[in-house]
Amino acid sequence: MAELKPFIFVPLYIYPTETSWQPLLAAAAKHPQLFFKVVVNPKNGPGPEALPDANYVTGLRALASLANVCVLGYIHCSWGERDQAELENDIMVYAGWTVRSPGIRIDGIFIDESPANAALVGYVAATARFVRKTFANPATVVYNPGVVVHVAFYQAADFIVIFENRASEWPSDFVQSNLSKLGPELRRKSIVIAHSCASQGLQLKLGRRLFQEYRIPGQLVTTQAGYASWCPYWESYWDEMRRWYNRSITLEGTSAGV
């Protein structure tokens, strides 16, 4: 019987000052049974330097000190148009951080703007293979096409973001019809990012439903329109989700409640 712990997915696109990452650091430290997958993105990727600036190094070391935080480096593939060599260079820079600066831990790569065209399965899979070949430890690879994609994409990915949109779009016939094509084993490798949620109540309701009914382990539901600032209800959101973190999501033999 397949089991998977749910997690909160955090695009941490906030510059690290002394306090700007504290909402995440405090949540992870207070409740070590909660799991977070966190994307860091210094310069639309790692940037040209061998290491990010001192503030990033300090922030990354703080993240690395938390065993319940998985740190992913951001790269983008421009929907399949970016040259493979450029992607590989970004990946090598992230892998180099852990060598050049003790205390930094990069656990994998987040591939943004991943293509949804099934003809490009091999393109993204080659990137995933390069990640795993480059990192010394087993690496997590997350694709972000933002929509449901062909099953073949799941073969090389650990997780795929199947929805990144306004929360109001989640109940739409288009989304739900595509979601119904994903069986339990694919849902267990899926992530939902729902932004611009209209209220705190709707935020918490959707968060619960993603875990309880849809059996999707990874999520971020926020009232913010983007990821450059914290949701004002961040603490109540993760506190509500916390009650699910002590329960494994059992996916084998369950219905998804679409």
Placement of each model-derived feature along the sequence:
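Glycan-processing catalytic domains of CAZymes
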Residues: 1-258
